[in-house]
Amino acid sequence: MHSGTVTVVNDWALFGHPLFLQRLEDLIEEVEGLAEEDPDGFHHHAHYKLLEKVEEAILVRVPTNPAAPEYFQGKTLGKENGHWRRIKNGLPNRYRLFFQFRSDAPKSIIYAWLNDEATLRKDGSKTDVYAVFLAKLKRGEIPSSFAELERDAGPIPGHAG
């Protein structure tokens, strides 16, 4: 894991794969730009709302109980990827955020990937969020094992926006 200040919530250390951390940083920068352009109305923009929901999920909801049944993704990614969890509820429609966790010490949650407008949920589509995430796993762009994911991960900022 990369060094830096680690955010800990409910005894869970929070980390992100570089793809997630970059997506989060890009989203923050975009929202900051929106705030400069329209200080009174930026909070109505879809990307502000997405950032707000992602922050709530990664800093509040998931660290409350990352093993909650609502995060199970079933067999959508295949039997061999059943260890992956996904955040669906609480995010804008058709967005998913994938993560893994380990409850043995040190307790860690690693957020791996959040889809974008080009990869929204659409069952059967080549650009469906699950199809794209599975392709990233198969190409090794995102490691499937927790140990490899942990090796690549960096700390999640304590307050993203």
Tell where the protein language model's regions lie, with residue ranges:
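Enriched for short, Lys/Arg-rich terminal
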Residues: 1-15, 29, 77-78, 82-161
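A short, surface-exposed loop/turn module that caps and links secondary-structure elements
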Residues: 56, 60-89
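N-terminal "first-domain core" detector
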Residues: 1-58
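Secondary-structure transition/capping residues
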Residues: 31, 35-38, 69, 73, ...
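A structural signal for alpha-helix termini and helix-coil/disorder junctions
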Residues: 26, 30-33, 64-68, 139, ...
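A short, hydrophobic secondary-structure junction motif
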Residues: 47-64, 136-144
